[in-house]
């Protein structure tokens, strides 16, 4: 049984002791990292979230404490009182390596069984074990550094927004289901049998209502929930830095957030963000990089060869152009010697993005090698090489198809090759704003338009008339902030006119009745002098991944779910008692074999 503190107070953290503390009598508390018994002396490395302190116990220092210290084992939780002294053999690898603590008194606060994982940096254990024993995994110094970074990030964000006149306000977690996009997590109501709350996918509607209420600068750091298939680096519950402002346009929101990003990345990560951040229209991003989340740390931009081969009789090129598509290519420098097997793998790669194939031209020192050379005239080959600014040693990779297939496949291929060639500077942070997104996308299966972001996004002033005639060409007052090929956050200016909002719902295929059934409270609010407003939300978890230098979202969330949205620690979700279900008016339907 562990000893009680009985009024004993910790006076210093393990990682805080330095030479200027020599001579001080202190009390430290933490976990035993390791113990070394050298006969007349016992050395204990004691760890807390700030670091490690070496403690030395000896018969000459205090016999009782020396004998008691021999009983401690790895991960025992102990308290030690003694004097900080200069270390005879300094350890330059430890921040506290110049000093040690002479252990004069020890309390064993609690014992520990042998841990299923070793508490150290760079743990080599399976993800399932780490998540099952997450409370032990979180003791590791590299994990504790991550959560100190997370804390500091939230503090810097709060301080900055407070200094800029924002109010931190909370919005409901139990809210109304408005199914558009990802599935909602539903919560049954006990008072209203057969009815459900939804957990919010974002605070979107409530923060807009706060603008109507006159709270012109709102923010919160809040949980959001999406019941979707968990691709890499997705979690069913995640955290947003959410904000909304009244009486603003795009430039106002962007300028404020550039200053916020510069402050966060400098103060937390020591990273300089060059301002103003580059802005790139969606159309340019897709045409040059094949993605609305372009990684700008390397070149290999997509080039349009359609004009150069518009008269070609090569049926692959001709067919794509006649069908309204295009012929585009990327250039992989110094890759002309790539073998046939490697190129075959690249062809298989683009087919996963629905491309029918991948044409290639290897520009070698003494020849141009290509399986499509025989289908091209000398002038067409020359035009391609000139357009690609090709030099000896370059490999040109070409896709001819519908534009969306060309963009997606070449964009993915560009990233794939850059990673294979290891040409991405991992120490560089390249921000870019993507602007002028399409407002709508046509869903062929449902035969209707869907909002690219959400149905509350404002329309670019010059495109409003197109909403009636060519909805697919309408651009949104939307903006995403992208860092190194990852979306860090996104936002937009919102519609604040009830008639225009109703029209937007109509274009999306909502009847007036359906729109009012789902969003009537918002449309009603818009009758009472709503201000122009807009905002932005960051994925806090992804931001911390960049600042902490980890590629796994589970590393930055204290108790994450696994890839199947299951918690190995608590075994949630779990079966609940029948009487709980009965109280909620829910009956289980057994699966038929």
Curated annotation (Swiss-Prot):
Location relative to the cell: Cytoplasm
Annotated region (Aspartate), positions in chain: 204-207
A Pfam family matched in the record: tRNA_anti-codon
Keyword Kinase: no
SUPFAM superfamilies to which the protein is assigned, alphabetical: Class II aaRS and biotin synthetases, GAD domain-like, Nucleic acid-binding proteins
UniProt entry keywords in alphabetical sequence: Aminoacyl-tRNA synthetase, ATP-binding, Cytoplasm, Ligase, Nucleotide-binding, Protein biosynthesis
Gene Ontology BP annotations: aspartyl-tRNA aminoacylation
Subunit structure: Homodimer.
Family membership: Belongs to the class-II aminoacyl-tRNA synthetase family. Type 1 subfamily.
Role summary: Catalyzes the attachment of L-aspartate to tRNA(Asp) in a two-step reaction: L-aspartate is first activated by ATP to form Asp-AMP and then transferred to the acceptor end of tRNA(Asp).
Protein name: Aspartate--tRNA ligase
Organism: Clostridium botulinum (strain Langeland / NCTC 10281 / Type F)
């Amino acid at each position: 049984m562990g000893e009680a503190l009985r009024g004993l107070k910790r006076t210093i953290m393990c990682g805080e002791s330095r030479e200027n503390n020599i001579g001080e009598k202190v009390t430290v508390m933490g976990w035993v990292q390791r113990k070394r018994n050298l006969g007349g002396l016992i050395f204990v490395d004691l760890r807390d979230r700030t670091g490690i302190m070496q403690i030395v116990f000896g018969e000459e220092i205090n016999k009782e404490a020396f004998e008691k210290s021999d009983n401690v084992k790895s991960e025992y939780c102990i308290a030690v009182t003694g004097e900080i002294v200069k270390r005879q053999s300094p350890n330059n690898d430890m921040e506290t390596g110049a000093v040690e603590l002479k252990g004069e008194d020890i309390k064993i606060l609690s014992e520990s069984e042998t841990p299923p994982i070793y508490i150290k940096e760079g743990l080599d254990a399976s993800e399932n074990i780490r998540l099952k024993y997450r409370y032990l995994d979180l003791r590791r110094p590299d994990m504790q550094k991550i959560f100190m970074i997370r804390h500091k990030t939230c503090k810097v964000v709060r301080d900055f927004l407070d200094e800029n006149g924002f109010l931190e306000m909370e919005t409901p977690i139990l809210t109304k289901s408005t199914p558009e996009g990802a599935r909602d997590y539903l919560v049954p109501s006990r008072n209203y049998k057969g009815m459900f709350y939804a957990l919010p996918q974002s605070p979107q509607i409530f923060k807009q209502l706060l603008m109507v209420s006159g709270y012109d600068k709102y923010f919160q750091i809040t949980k959001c929930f999406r019941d979707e298939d968990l691709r890499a680096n997705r979690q069913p519950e995640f955290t947003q830095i959410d904000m909304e402002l009244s009486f603003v346009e795009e430039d106002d929101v962007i300028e404020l957030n550039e200053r916020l990003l510069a402050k966060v990345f400098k103060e937390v990560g020591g990273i300089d963000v060059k301002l103003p951040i580059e802005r790139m229209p969606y159309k340019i991003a897709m045409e040059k990089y094949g993605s609305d989340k372009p990684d700008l740390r390397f070149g290999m931009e997509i080039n349009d060869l359609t004009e150069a081969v518009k008269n070609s009789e090569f049926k692959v090129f001709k067919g794509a152009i006649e069908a309204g598509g295009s012929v585009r290519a990327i250039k992989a420098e110094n890759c002309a010697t790539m073998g046939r097997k490697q190129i075959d793998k690249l062809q298989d790669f683009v087919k996963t993005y629905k491309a029918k194939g991948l044409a290639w031209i290897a520009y070698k020192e003494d020849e141009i090698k290509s399986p499509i050379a025989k289908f091209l005239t000398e002038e067409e080959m020359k035009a391609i090489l000139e357009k690609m600014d090709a030099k000896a040693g370059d490999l040109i990779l070409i896709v001819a198809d519908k534009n969306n297939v060309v963009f997606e496949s070449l964009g993915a291929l560009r990233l794939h090759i850059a990673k294979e060639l290891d040409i991405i500077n991992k120490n560089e942070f390249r921000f870019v704003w993507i602007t002028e997104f399409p407002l709508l996308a046509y869903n062929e299966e449902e035969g209707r338009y869907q909002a690219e972001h959400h149905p509350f996004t404002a329309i670019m002033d010059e495109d409003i008339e197109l909403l009636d005639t060519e909805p697919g060409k309408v651009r949104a007052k939307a903006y995403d902030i992208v860092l190194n090929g990852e979306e860090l956050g996104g936002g937009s200016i919102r519609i604040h006119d009830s008639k225009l909002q109703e029209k937007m719902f109509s274009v999306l295929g909502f009847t007036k009745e359906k729109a009012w059934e789902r969003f009537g409270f918002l449309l009603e609010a818009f009758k009472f002098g709503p201000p122009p407003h807009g905002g932005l939300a960051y994925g806090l978890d992804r931001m911390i991944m960049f600042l902490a230098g980890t590629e796994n979202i589970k590393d930055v969330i204290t108790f994450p779910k696994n890839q199947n949205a299951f918690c190995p620690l608590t075994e949630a979700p779990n079966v609940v008692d029948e009487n709980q279900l009965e109280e909620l008016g829910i009956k289980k339907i057994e699966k038929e074999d």
